[in-house]
């Protein structure tokens, strides 16, 4: 079976622009939570916003100011550009592809169009909402980087980026491509904020994944991309190997997590097996850990079923960056690769009391200099779409 290597990383989130800024914030325990400033809203809940405005993002990308870009596309362009530059590849080759994901697409641009149209129907221009479709941001990234190979968009809610990474790996393993830029992007918008509020799972305080008092999630925005390559196409030393992956569709509920953790159990156990490992080989778990009562309970039960009493160190970065929906595993895959690269375990912020049922206690302090060989990273979406990835050191 062909090995899949990670050779490029790119990320933007509420804790930084670029890989180095994100890593510095994780090391310092610096979260990105604050009040909503991107748009007016009656909701008083913390979110993790990317600090740059749309115009600032356009300038960073040297884009024309007169053209309409959704914020989702701008965030994706910046992270994808960083990953592409890091990999040092010619992305115009037909053997290089792009698999990008998003949950809400260009909804933020559509909301701006709707507001101006309601104010004066002569102001609304239909060409301003061409970025509404989920595939629009992917097409913009492909055009910006000159990608001529396979270009595909995935949207499976919060597991989107994990599934994009898996599809990219499969295309390489089957010999269809030599390299693929994979990941996801999502921006904050009213649709997302009001939608999660209607589900009554937004915490009015900073989220507390796996804590007994957890009361919901905090939303965030950002983008994360990786470049995956086959061994024969390598031109630089890779960061690590994408050694395993799996997706399990339990279809328990449209928005809720299965109480017995069947979906997470299947995706985690199958990803570990796909990597040719046993549960005892996992050194760190980047859990999905949104901070909602049902998600953390479900994921906790699955972890107990797989690892029993030998639970490896685990943590959630959602209290740093919020839940970035379709971008979450793109961003967190970058963090997982950095964990292996530098021997790091990130803290779960705001954790104080262990859950009475699971008894699980995540890592609460930043740890470095550790022999991290295998990282399991989880990403679970609405509709029971559960995905897990395993990243491994080069000499395993």
Predicted segments with their positions:
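ACP-dependent fatty acid/polyketide chain-elongation machinery
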Residues: 1-63, 232-241, 334-349, 392-396
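Condensing-enzyme catalytic core mediating Claisen C-C bond formation in acyl metabolism
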Residues: 3-7, 27-36, 202, 206-275, ...
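Conserved small-residue
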Residues: 8, 26, 80, 98, ...
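Active-site pocket-shaping loop/turn-to-helix segments
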Residues: 14, 61-81, 125-133, 151-163, ...
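Conserved active-site "lid/cap" helical segment
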Residues: 15, 20-21, 25-100, 106-107, ...
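Active-site-proximal alpha-helical scaffold in enzymes
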Residues: 76-88, 134, 142-145, 151-183, ...
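Active-site-proximal gating segment of KS-fold condensing enzymes and close homologs
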Residues: 102-152, 295-309
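Acyl-CoA/ACP chain-elongation machinery
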Residues: 176-198, 203-214, 245-259, 287-296, ...
């Amino acid at each position: 079976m062909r090995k899949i290597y990670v050779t490029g990383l790119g990320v933007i989130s509420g804790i930084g622009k670029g890989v180095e800024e994100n890593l510095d914030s994780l090391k310092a325990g610096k979260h990105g939570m604050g009040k909503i400033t991107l748009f007016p809203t009656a909701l008083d809940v913390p979110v993790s916003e990317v600090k740059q405005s749309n115009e600032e993002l356009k300038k960073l990308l040297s884009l024309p100011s007169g053209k309409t870009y959704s914020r989702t596309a701008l965030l994706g362009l910046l992270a994808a550009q960083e990953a592409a530059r890091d990999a040092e590849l010619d992305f115009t080759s037909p053997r290089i592809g792009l698999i990008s994901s998003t949950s809400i697409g260009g909804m933020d641009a559509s909301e701006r169009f709707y507001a101006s149209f309601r104010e004066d129907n002569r102001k609304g221009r239909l060409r301003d909402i061409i970025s509404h479709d989920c595939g629009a941001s992917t097409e913009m990234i492909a055009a910006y980087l000159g990608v001529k190979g396979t270009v595909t968009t995935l949207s499976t809610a919060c597991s989107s980026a994990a599934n994009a990474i898996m599809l990219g790996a499969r295309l390489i393993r089957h010999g269809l491509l030599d390299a693929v830029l994979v990941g996801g992007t999502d921006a904050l918008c009213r649709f997302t904020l009001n939608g999660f509020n209607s589900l009554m799972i937004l915490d009015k305080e900073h989220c507390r994944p796996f804590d007994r008092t957890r009361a919901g999630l905090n939303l965030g925005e950002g983008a994360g991309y990786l470049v995956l390559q086959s061994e024969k196409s390598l031109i630089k030393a890779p960061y690590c190997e994408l050694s395993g992956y799996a997706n399990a569709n339990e279809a328990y509920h449209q928005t809720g997590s299965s109480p017995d953790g069947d979906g997470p159990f299947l995706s985690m156990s199958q990803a570990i097996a796909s990597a040719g490992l046993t549960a005892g080989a996992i050194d760190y778990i980047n859990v999905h850990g949104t901070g909602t009562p049902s998600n953390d309970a479900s994921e906790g039960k699955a972890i107990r079923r797989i690892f029993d009493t030998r639970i490896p160190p685990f943590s959630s970065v959602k209290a740093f960056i919020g839940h970035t929906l379709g971008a979450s595993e793109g961003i967190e895959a970058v963090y997982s690769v950095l964990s292996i690269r530098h021997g790091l375990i990130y803290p779960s912020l705001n954790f104080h009391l262990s859950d009475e049922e699971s008894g699980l206690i995540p890592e609460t302090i930043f740890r470095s200099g550790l022999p991290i060989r295998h990282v399991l990273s989880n990403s679970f979406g609405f509709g029971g779409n559960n995905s897990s990835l395993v990243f491994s050191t080069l000499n395993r």
